[in-house]
């Protein structure tokens, strides 16, 4: 049986140490490594050793019982949350570690919410019970208050095959048929055991145990019970399907695509349908354990593996018969520019950043052609420091990043029609687009109401491709436009003169001309926050959120604790954790998750500070080009409508 398990926690809760113990007890590694000794098996990258934190979601393998386990040790720092989320996508089961001293911390909430989103069955391990101040019961109360009340203690069960009376009743109370059986006939071990496995797999109950990973207390016992209580049901007889969850370029520059097989089998030299539907041939299958791998000929459903030969699949793509694409919650809200040493050609260095972009698509590496600059999206300052070091180690490039800025976006709040015509000599394309405000955080949606007598289906699809093939600049700050519904009304091509690229020009001009006529709105990223403080600190938090232009829900209380939730601009709240720690003496807790884009609270000031001039953007123009007497001429946006050929 194949099982993929993930170890997740707030930074410094003991994830990597716990993972090392699992690998050691199952003889996957011969020597226990330690984070503080810089020899942990899964923190094999130099930067992880130096910083003492997990940056990459690396995997190990071990055999236990009748199962093969694929273990993923995930980053615990918020700056590397996208890496963690991509790993969660392929987990069959998760183990959340919580320190018995610190309890639930900010990132633990993020982990829990993501596991709920992906419906991953979850176990809890309360770690560091050997430390002064450890309070297991207090942590369990926190879990019940903040996460779930369906916690079940497995520490006193299954050692000799029996289940404690408390656990017997706990299971029966959560299944009406089982409760009736219990009342009539009493406890039946096999029935309860199967029902418990089913409830765990369905994320209806959440087993827990406690121990101290560093001292090897409770880990082996937990593994034994975890193995008994977890089952998977992958089908290798079905056609092959899988998720791409990671991409890396190895030391030779070979693109390595990591896949979780969901069904079927895959062999070397097999063709596989990738993200764009094209078939690509697998040239090599690798089975990784830490930084080492062995080549194999075939994989089956439920296995984690890597392939070479695949170039068109991206992180989050389904492959084989799976045609879905993942949409991730962990989205960067900051943007930074790369600064090179004198003498370095940024365009030549771009290829290295595009490799990083393939490995981590949340970076959204962008080449600003006019400025000859590289920009990328990031979660925070720690990520920038790590990227600087990675780029030097891998590519021998010394770079620094400018101070990151908020990543703004733009949209409109009224319906308009945009017209674009592109007709230099021996070229021709015309497009009419209806542009409407879309739902907030929906992106750009495209549909066509154009008749095939006007434009072929192929050209109509081409218009849609041009709308989503890149980020388009808004008029206010040059930030990406979003939340639009764009409908192709009509268009025209020329049998002789329409060439490749003509419709791209017409589409971009039509979109821009429509924006010129619209009411444009600046958007900024918001956090959803959850803050837990004592009740006598409610007033301070309410005042701070109001000053940060946030919106707060009605506070809730739980004993002497107050729970405050709401949304607030990233720009005004990104450093609030330090302030919270200061006035609560480190006892306040806060979790922040991306809440999408909403109207900017200080749009006028931002527009003035950025100073974007819509009339001199070399990549975009709202003017159209017409042809008369063998010569092309430009017509400004406010005069172009009257000259359109389709009107």
Model-derived features: positions:
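Short glycine-/aliphatic-rich beta-strand segments at the starts of folded cytosolic domains
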Residues: 329-342, 446-449, 523-533
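C-terminal accessory nucleic-acid interaction domains of nucleic acid-metabolism proteins
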Residues: 556, 563-647
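P-loop NTPase switch module centered on the Walker A-proximal segment
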Residues: 1-90, 94-98, 104, 145-153, ...
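P-loop NTPase catalytic nucleotide-binding module
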Residues: 1-13, 100-251, 272, 305
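Conserved nucleotide-binding/hydrolysis micro-motifs of P-loop NTPases
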Residues: 13, 29, 77-78, 101-104, ...
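Conserved nucleotide-binding/hydrolysis modules and their immediate coupling elements
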Residues: 229-231, 235-336, 373
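C-terminal polymerase-core module
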Residues: 405-469, 492-494, 515, 529-531, ...
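C-terminal effector modules of nucleic-acid-centric enzymes and ribosome-associated factors
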Residues: 288-414, 457-516, 538, 573, ...
